[in-house]
UniProtKB/Swiss-Prot annotation:
This is Uncharacterized protein HI_0131. It comes from Haemophilus influenzae (strain ATCC 51907 / DSM 11121 / KW20 / Rd). One of its GO terms (molecular function) is thiamine pyrophosphate binding. GO terms for cellular component: outer membrane-bounded periplasmic space. Transmembrane segments: none annotated. Residues 1-27 form the signal peptide. Coiled coil: none annotated. InterPro entries: Ferric-bd (IPR026045). Keywords: Signal. Gene3D superfamilies: Periplasmic binding protein-like II.
Length: 346
């Protein structure tokens, strides 16, 4: 496949809560966004959309798993219009449960063909706005202090006893990043071998974080030697000066598709459709790396990629099965098994 300052008026309290508002007092309606991307991308995206279309736009930021739980809890009284960012699977699961409104964007034909398929398969409930490569980042300075000379290159290198308490990965109950990792291991090796690996990895994990982004920040600061997650988060930390080496594991790896969808019962449906169109457009996607400090691979074929974006054609990627691993029962079963056999196991 080929991939060819206006200030935001918002109170400190709202920013601390992860909610921002943009648009004029006489705006053409409203839009409430549940956002599972980074806080800066959430803020940049909603601000730019609100200013371009004169829509009073607000967002609440949470991880994909937490947002899914919120959307499900609010199904009889939806509090938002759009779900933007984060991994595709939870949004696909929400669609399966009737929590997402189908919408085929006018920009769908500009999206990389293979990335249109999840949307088509699910009935155009969720559209793909970016791709993120799963891997890990290694703090080389902290690794050297452990007396380890060679940077780990494979998933199974992370089970090295010398790395006890030195690895961080998110919790799949709250973070779509971690569920993507879990589903990737199962697709790489089969369920039994995948869970054997996770059990062997467990003593080396210092923390299962709530957010998938946190391990990148903690490894960048030297609070962990290795963080598992999407490599664009680690690329940003490295660009900012962190002593990180980014690793695409030797066995192969999976990837996320960042999703955007309209919530069932959206009160501002026309603005929600407009937002999805904009998020899939060249302009909306390029905003991610030009202003939003997000270095994912963009899915719009007309969009300019970040100079640091990976070329997926050169990576050893699995054929990630979004249909199977985005299904409600499959996702629920894998997460429950992980909780019982890994996280809570003695």
């Amino acid at each position: 496949m080929k991939f060819n300052k206006i200030s935001l008026s918002v109170s400190t309290a709202l920013l601390a809560a992860g909610l921002a508002v943009s648009g004029s007092a006489n705006a053409k309606g409203r839009l409430v966004v549940y956002c599972s991307a980074t806080n800066i991308l959430c803020e940049t995206t909603t601000k730019a959309f609100g200013e371009k279309y004169d829509v009073k736009t607000s967002f609440i930021r949470n991880g994909s798993g937490s947002t899914f739980a919120k959307v499900e809890a609010e199904k009889n009284n939806p509090q938002a219009d759009v779900w933007f960012g984060g991994t595709f699977d939870p949004q696909a699961q929400a669609a399966e449960l009737g929590l997402i409104e189908p919408y085929k964007s006018k920009h769908i034909d500009e999206i990389v063909e293979r990335f249109r398929e999840p949307a088509k398969t699910k009935g155009h409930y969720v559209s793909s706005i970016y791709m993120g490569i799963l891997g890990f980042g290694v703090n080389t300075e902290r690794l050297a202090k452990l007396g380890i000379k060679e940077v780990p290159k494979c998933w199974k290198d992370l089970t090295d006893p010398r790395l006890k308490g030195e690895v961080q990965i998110a919790d799949p109950q709250s973070a779509g990043t971690a569920y993507t990792a879990l589903a990737t291991f199962v697709q790489l090796w089969g369920e039994k071998e995948a869970f054997d690996f996770l059990k062997e990895l467990h003593p080396n994990v210092s923390q299962y974080t709530k957010s998938g982004i946190t391990p990148s920040r903690n490894s960048a600061r030297g609070e962990a030697t290795i963080g598992v997650g999407f490599l664009h988060d680690y690329a940003l930390e490295k660009r900012n000066g962190a002593p990180l080496e980014l690793v695409v594991p030797c066995e192969g790896t999976g990837y996320e598709l960042g999703g955007v969808s309209i919530l069932k019962g959206a009160r501002n449906i026309d603005n929600a459709k407009l937002f999805v169109d904009w998020a899939l457009s060249k302009e909306g996607q390029e905003l991610a790396w030009k202003q939003g400090d997000s270095l994912q691979i963009l899915t719009n074929t007309t969009a300019e990629q970040s100079p640091t974006a990976f070329d997926p054609n050169k990576l050893k990627l699995i054929n990630y099965d979004f249909e199977k691993y985005g299904a409600t029962e499959q996702r629920k079963a894998l997460i429950e098994k992980w909780v019982q056999e890994v996280k809570l196991a003695k």
